[in-house]
């Protein structure tokens, strides 16, 4: 049993195959089989209207014009070598931007470490006033001991503190 109305014949003059799932060319609007549906497969006279490729550069996202017959990959490669405006070294954000203000030190830090007295920017090694010879508050910073070490020395230890508290309650 045949179904003469089912499917369509390929419009290619040399083929004329009955195809149950024909593909219509979007340029010339004719029906073709799977072997002849491409523009080059049936030598479409209107292919120049549809066969336009404009690849985009993967680096700078600019459209790259491609002439007929040129391979798009080659044209994009040439653009990347010659005309591309993307420069990875120039556009990259620097991570270590805060340079140490101590003479002779060339270290850079991710975060700004400012001295509370002179407000200079220093690295981890030179962030304390004693480490960078801070001149702004020289009277409050002694060379022998810092105020933190003196406060720790004046504070009684756990056992002596407990003993003092017990003496006060006994009296």
Swiss-Prot record:
It comes from the Eukaryota. The keyword Cytoplasm applies. It is found in: Cytoplasm; Nucleus. Its main location: cytoplasm. One of its GO terms (cellular component) is cytoplasm. Keywords: Cytoplasm, Metal-binding, Nucleus, Repeat, Zinc, Zinc-finger. A zinc finger (AN1-type) spans 4-52, 94-142. Zn(2+) 3 binds at residues 100, 105, 123, 126. One of its GO terms (molecular function) is zinc ion binding. Residues 136-151 have a biased composition (Low complexity). Pfam families: zf-AN1, zf-C2H2_ZFAND2. This is AN1-type zinc finger protein 2A. It comes from Rattus norvegicus. The lineage of its organism: Eukaryota, Metazoa, Chordata, Craniata, Vertebrata. The gene is Zfand2a.
């Amino acid at each position: 049993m045949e179904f003469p109305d089912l499917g369509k014949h390929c419009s290619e003059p040399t083929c004329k195959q009955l195809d149950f799932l024909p593909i219509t060319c979007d340029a010339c609007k004719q029906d073709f089989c799977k072997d002849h549906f491409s523009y080059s497969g049936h030598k479409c006279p209107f292919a120049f209207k549809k066969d336009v490729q404009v690849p985009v550069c993967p680096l700078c996202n600019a459209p790259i014009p491609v002439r007929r017959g040129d391979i798009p990959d080659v044209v994009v490669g040439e653009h990347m070598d010659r005309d591309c405006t993307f420069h990875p070294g120039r556009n990259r954000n620097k991570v270590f931007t805060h340079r140490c203000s101590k003479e002779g030190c060339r270290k850079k830090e991710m975060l700004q470490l400012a001295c509370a007295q002179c407000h200079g920017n220093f690295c981890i090694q030179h962030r304390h006033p004693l480490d960078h010879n801070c001149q702004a508050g020289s009277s409050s910073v002694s060379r022998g001991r810092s105020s933190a070490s003196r406060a720790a020395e004046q504070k009684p230890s756990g056992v002596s503190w407990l003993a003092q508290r017990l003496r006060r309650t006994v009296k």
